[in-house]
UniProtKB/Swiss-Prot annotation:
Chain residues carrying a lipid of type S-diacylglycerol cysteine: C24
Family to which this protein belongs: Belongs to the OXA1/ALB3/YidC family. Type 2 subfamily.
Transmembrane segments: 58-78, 135-155, 179-199, 209-225, 231-251
Subcellular compartments: Cell membrane
Biased composition (Polar residues): 271-288
Any one GO molecular-function label of the UniProt entry: membrane insertase activity
Stretches for region Disordered: 263-307
Function in brief: Required for the insertion and/or proper folding and/or complex formation of integral membrane proteins into the membrane. Involved in integration of membrane proteins that insert both dependently and independently of the Sec translocase complex, as well as at least some lipoproteins.
Record bears the keyword Nucleus: no
Protein name in UniProt: Membrane protein insertase YidC 2
Example of a GO cellular component annotation carried by this entry: plasma membrane
Length: 307
């Protein structure tokens, strides 16, 4: 159940990223980008790509890389904040495992659907009582703020005039590149592997599918788009690795120490359910309770007939 939910959430998130990148910026009748995101973000990015390519004489390939580095550096704090939230929830779950383990055991050993649902409800209540939100680590707001920048840069790399007719290190930026696609896939696979190293063995088993989902998605997108856009994904892969390294070796150790000190002062207590277990056979009890009344009523009816 939990593994299936994680797969659904991650697959939905991956598809949302793809649709958002193509949906934040609209197109006119001629297929050119338009809309508020393009006007306020995409056009300035396209201008700087053109500036670095022509005025600075760096070429369009290097220009895309430089502008992508600038954009990703500006929004890196949002990505780190998102990682911090997810890591905080993960670390708390690790420390609170002894509290939730008995309830999880009851869920696995439930003999009926009603018993399983009751245990799941109790688990959710216990998580709320200890400040755990299963979806709290996703960090929707930082992700939503980043999406317009991703989308604008995506379209700037694709539609800036001159990109499609240029080359970079022997790669035609207007055509698909198998070499670039392979490098991008390797980068995102390495980033996924790094993220697996930062979690417990149990969580690692649950995240195996997610480890391959992102690289496969990046292969699909990189190979179906021109190499100019692939350079954008390439730089994004390096930044994803940088963000993951900061999360794994800086954020998580600090959070682990912080939460350990918090629970050392106030150790977590086992959750006490406030609701009592209900009788699963209320109809039988009611029938037994009403039985004497029925008998008494029948006796009175017999006396009346004798009279």
């Amino acid at each position: 159940m939990k593994l299936t939910l994680n797969r659904i959430l991650f697959s939905g998130l991956a598809l949302s990223i793809l649709f958002t990148l193509t949906g934040c910026v609209g197109r006119d009748a001629h297929g050119n980008p338009k809309g508020m995101i393009w006007e306020f973000l995409g056009k300035p990015m396209s201008y700087f790509i053109d500036y670095f390519a022509n005025n600075a004489g760096l070429g369009y390939g290097l220009a895309i890389i430089i502008v992508t580095i600038i954009v990703r550096t500006l929004i890196l704090p949002l990505g780190l904040y998102q990682s911090w939230k997810a890591s905080y929830q993960s670390e708390k779950m690790t420390f609170l495992k002894p509290v939730f383990e008995p309830i999880n055991k009851r869920i696995k050993q439930a003999s009926s659907q009603e018993e399983k649902m009751a245990a799941q409800t109790e688990l959710m209540a216990a998580q709320r009582a200890h400040g755990i939100n299963p979806l709290g680590g996703i960090g929707c707001l930082p992700l939503l703020i980043q999406m317009p920048f991703f989308s604008a840069m995506y379209f700037a790399a694709q539609y800036t005039k001159g990109v499609s007719t240029s080359t970079f290190m022997g790669i035609d930026l207007g055509s698909r590149s198998l070499v670039l696609t392979a490098i991008i896939a390797a980068l995102y696979f390495f980033q996924s592997w790094l993220s697996m190293m930062a979690v417990s063995e149990e969580q690692r088993e649950q995240m195996k599918t997610m480890m391959y989902t992102m690289p496969i998605m990046m292969i699909f997108m990189s190979f179906s788009l021109p190499a100019g856009v692939g350079l954008y994904w390439l730089v994004g892969g390096f930044f994803s690795i940088i963000q993951q390294l900061i999360t794994t070796y800086l954020l998580k150790p600090r959070l682990h120490k912080q939460i350990k000190e918090e629970y050392a002062k106030t150790p977590p207590k086992a959750y006490q359910s406030t609701s009592s277990r209900k009788d699963v056979t209320p109809s039988q009890n009611m029938e037994q309770a009403n039985l004497p009344k029925k008998i008494k009523s029948n006796r009175n009816a017999g006396k009346q007939r004798k009279r």
